[in-house]
């Protein structure tokens, strides 16, 4: 849930021009039977994670929706749906000129990779398609990321950023292709 909150903030708000100091979030949990102690424990851990994100980014969760009792009975006992967390967000764009897209804008522009990366392939499409079963799942450093987001926003509002794209599905190669194809 922490990484999901992070992705919403980074990919859907900050990258396109929202002020990182003026964002809000909404949560949606889809889970199995909360009367099952293990399932209730999963909910507690999810809530702890999004509370950490809300504190770190000073981004309140102002509303949400919870969908529980998503399970079914079988001869072998109940089966809960996998825990699913959806984070939606909104941000303040102080100047419409600061809203940018993800496609490459000008030839001979410099491309920068910002942020910190680790060997974290767990849960990725690459890991799934290449049989990597023991990869580390992505972690996030909220405090470091917030400082990065503020620096990025400063560059953006100074007119130094022409376009931006998150690196998620498919990594750097897919991101570069998406930026090139969409322009």
Regions found by a protein language model. Name each.
Residues 1, 84, 123-139, 156:
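Gly-rich Lys/Arg/Thr-decorated short loops/hinges at beta-loop-alpha junctions or inter-strand turns
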Residues 2-8:
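Short, small-residue-biased leader/transition segments that mark boundaries at the very start
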Residues 10-19, 103, 110-111, 162-179:
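Conserved phosphate/anionic-ligand binding catalytic regions in large, soluble enzymes, centered on
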Residues 39-53, 57, 62-85, 134, ...:
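Glycine-/charge-enriched secondary-structure boundary and capping motifs
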Residues 75-84, 94-116:
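Acidic/histidine-enriched ion/cofactor-binding microenvironments in catalytic or ligand-binding pockets
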């Amino acid at each position: 849930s922490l990484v999901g909150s992070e992705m919403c903030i980074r990919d859907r708000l900050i990258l396109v021009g929202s002020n990182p100091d003026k964002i809000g979030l909404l949560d949606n949990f889809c889970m199995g039977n909360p009367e099952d102690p293990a399932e209730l424990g999963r909910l507690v851990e999810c809530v702890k994670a999004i509370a950490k994100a809300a504190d770190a980014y000073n981004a309140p969760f102002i509303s949400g929706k919870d969908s529980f009792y998503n399970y079914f009975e079988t001869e072998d006992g109940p089966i809960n749906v996998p825990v699913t967390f959806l984070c939606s967000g909104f941000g303040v764009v102080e100047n419409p000129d600061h809203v940018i897209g993800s496609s490459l804008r000008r030839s001979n522009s410099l491309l920068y990779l910002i942020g910190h990366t680790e060997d974290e392939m767990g849960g990725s499409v690459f890991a799934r398609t290449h049989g990597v079963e023991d990869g580390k799942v992505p972690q996030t450093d909220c405090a470091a990321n917030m400082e990065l987001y503020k620096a990025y926003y400063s560059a953006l509002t100074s007119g130094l950023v022409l376009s931006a794209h998150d690196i998620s599905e498919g990594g750097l190669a897919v991101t570069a292709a998406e930026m090139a194809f969409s322009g």
